[in-house]
From Swiss-Prot:
This is Aspartyl/glutamyl-tRNA(Asn/Gln) amidotransferase subunit C. It is an enzyme of class 6 (ligase). NCBIfam families: gatC. One of its GO terms (molecular function) is glutaminyl-tRNA synthase (glutamine-hydrolyzing) activity. Belongs to the GatC family. It comes from Brucella melitensis biotype 2 (strain ATCC 23457).
Length: 95
């Protein structure tokens, strides 16, 4: 798959990004290089290879789940203009 300048402009338009003509030409080359690398990765034989979740063989340390109030309710509502019992108070918007 290769990207041409019209594809770059179309994607930029869809993303609502302003792209100049010279930037679009530069991006065309960069995107084609990226897609070429991805195509190389698709050719790698990974049959029998276990998926990795980390590059190190460490296991995640587990801790016991404890239900708490978090202890920061007052800090969370500290900058709110109006609060009541550590809750935000907002104007009624639905009748």
């Amino acid at each position: 798959m290769s990207v041409d300048i019209s594809t770059v402009k179309r994607v930029a338009h869809l993303a609502r990004i302003a792209v100049s003509e010279e930037d679009a030409e530069r991006m065309t080359g960069e995107l084609n290089a990226i897609l070429g690398f991805v195509e190389q990765l698709n050719e790698v034989d990974v049959e029998g290879i276990e998926p990795m979740t980390s590059v190190t063989p460490m296991k995640m340390r587990m801790r016991e789940d404890k239900v708490t109030d978090g202890g920061i309710a007052a800090a969370v509502v500290a900058n709110a203009p109006v609060t009541e019992d550590n809750f935000f108070v907002v104007p009624k918007v639905v009748e």
